[in-house]
Amino acid sequence: MENMFRLMASEEYFSERRCVWVNGPVIVGAGPSGLATAACLHDQGVPFVVVERSDCIASLWQKRTYDRLKLHLPKKFCQLPKMPFPDHYPEYPTKRQFIDYLESYANRFDIKPEFNKSVESARFDETSGLWRVRTTSDGEEMEYICRWLVVATGENAERVVPEINGLMTEFDGEVIHACEYKSGEKFRGKRVLVVGCGNSGMEVSLDLANHNAITSMVVRSSVHVLPREIMGKSTFGISVMMMKWLPLWLVDKLLLILSWLVLGSLSNYGLKRPDIGPMELKSMTGKTPVLDIGALEKIKSGDVEIVPAIKQFSRHHVELVDGQKLDIDAVVLATGYRSNVPSWLQESEFFSKNGFPKSPFPNAWKGKSGLYAAGFTRKGLAGASVDAVNIAQDIGNVWREETKRQKMRRNVGHRRCISVA
């Protein structure tokens, strides 16, 4: 509280914007990472404020995902701390089921985010030793003053739109990002080019083919495609189990052998594997292997055509680097997402320029001066849950110690009053 008085004494404090003192941390982002952190803080008895730029929790899931989406991993690897999925949920919950789970999660732990508040800047005030988080909402500015700041905006805050020659200036067809794609129904009978071959690109291509779109998918570089299940068991679960006992290179070797037995060779279909194994590549770069849920069948049947990198677009065509020209009506950019942290967090010691913590897992959750990060480990919802537990315990330890000291001071003061009387 002394820090708060020191801040109020400065002229800058008395500005036109409204200021709010937060006893506990401010959590930026009401996605799964922010909700998990808030729930763990609630369990520790620590107050908090969650600010969210959208008008709902988990806005990526609610507003920027396609209709057919399901979790690609079994539900036990995707549940948040302190609340499992309902027993009646399938092994791979649907998008709607996952959203319902998150809403129930927020209700259970009394998480009430302050919606429609976009964080414009957050900086640590050296004079007061406090964080100053400035937000805007409908033109109104507000500043939150807090001791702890939890960055939970995630790895996928902003879509990535690559610069491709002629795409935005020459091409006359429809161009959308995968975050705007809902269903292949509107593209029935049309010639659609999907740019990107990650999990989203593969599933969008599958959905388009299922709706009888004439589908081509750009594959510029090598990619690991694994079956979602091997002999009825989750491929991810098998890899997690093996990594407990075996070195990473051997896990990769076994995974690739098993994948070859299930899927066969993919090189004849234009899908070349990287030289580095899938788990090692994930560990080194964060690049997730594709878990096949049906796209390979469409590729093998010719319903989805694999094409090389793009050279340029013209009015109704795309020219590829191998000289091919394709007639197309629409383009879906399955080109991924990025962190937006550098655009608003005024700090360079903990976060790098790409918006991810500089320290590798498992030390990427805590910075200095009360700064924390949840959900930036490139290890999915399980990694975000580990971050949330660590952050809440760390803040909770300080909170309980200070609460204990305050009670002791009050008790001493109370005894003095009695003795004087």
Swiss-Prot record:
What keywords appear on the UniProt entry?
A: Auxin biosynthesis, FAD, Flavoprotein, Monooxygenase, NADP, Oxidoreductase
Any GO molecular function = flavin adenine dinucleotide binding
Q: Which reaction does it catalyse?
A: indole-3-pyruvate + NADPH + O2 + H(+) = (indol-3-yl)acetate + CO2 + NADP(+) + H2O
Cofactors named for this entry: FAD
The UniProt transmembrane annotation reads none
> Annotated pathway, please?
Plant hormone metabolism; auxin biosynthesis
Known EC number: 1.14.13.168
Concerning what turns on (or off) its expression, the entry says: Up-regulated by drought.
BP terms from Gene Ontology: auxin biosynthetic process; response to ethylene; response to herbicide
Classify the source by domain of life.
Eukaryota
InterPro entries, per the entry: Auxin_biosynth/cation_transpt (IPR050982), FAD/NAD-bd_sf (IPR036188), Flavin_mOase-like (IPR020946)
Q: Which SUPFAM superfamilies match?
A: FAD/NAD(P)-binding domain (SSF51905)
- Which positions does UniProt annotate for FAD binding? 29-34
Residues annotated for NADP(+) binding in this entry: 196-201
Instruction: Please tell me which top-level EC class this enzyme sits in.
Output: oxidoreductase
> Its family?
Belongs to the FMO family.
**Classification via PANTHER family:** FLAVIN-BINDING MONOOXYGENASE-LIKE PROTEIN (AFU_ORTHOLOGUE AFUA_4G09220), INDOLE-3-PYRUVATE MONOOXYGENASE YUCCA9-RELATED
Function per UniProt: Involved in auxin biosynthesis. Belongs to the set of redundant YUCCA genes probably responsible for auxin biosynthesis in roots.
Annotated protein name in UniProt: Probable indole-3-pyruvate monooxygenase YUCCA9
